[in-house]
């Protein structure tokens, strides 16, 4: 029986069994000098990278040059920011890219968490280090009292820490916004499940390689027969 030519110019194998032959053909690249793999990887990995967490994405960026380029892609870090923090800032364009914006947001949230740890532990020296030593810093406690300037602010915290015990807040709905060397954080902080939340705004400035608090405003919302808000 005569053999039938194959599409690639070859002929089928002789014998009773069939055998599949895989051939590699050259496909014209639409980008001269760039392999098909390099063209396909960004398209394939963009979706896959959105499933990685922060440590995994950082580790990936330290592998080969191709993966490093993919892991440093702005869209990957924007997706991670939205997954870990909030969708509220979808329309912004960070000056130094989403990777740095993500890292700075983590740093701000860490400092903000430290603030509540200091309150819980009544650590006055740590609170003094957290605040910027400046005459323009402001602190408004839930009582409505305003303290202005570094010395007054720290003295106000000393009075708070002289109470019998520290406060262990449960913090929720944390939202940050960063503008170069300034950031503010809004949140709700609860002392117990029955009471209403404290509505808190903290403002930080970046000085000498560290984020320092420059403004704290706490108002309390009491939920009973009626809702009372202290601003």
UniProtKB/Swiss-Prot annotation:
Residues of the F-box domain: 34-80
Gene Ontology BP terms: protein ubiquitination
Described purpose of this protein according to its UniProt entry: Component of SCF(ASK-cullin-F-box) E3 ubiquitin ligase complexes, which may mediate the ubiquitination and subsequent proteasomal degradation of target proteins.
Oligomer status and interactors: Part of a SCF (ASK-cullin-F-box) protein ligase complex. Interacts with SKP1A/ASK1.
Keyword Zinc attributed: no
Pathways per UniProt: Protein modification; protein ubiquitination
Gene3D superfamilies: 1.20.1280.50, 3.10.450.50
Presence of keyword ATP-binding: no
Sorted UniProt keywords: Ubl conjugation pathway
Name of this protein: F-box protein SKIP8
CDD domains for the chain: F-box_FBXL4
A family per Pfam: SnoaL_3
Domain notes: The F-box is necessary for the interaction with ASK proteins.
Ranges for region Disordered: 1-24
Superkingdom field: Eukaryota
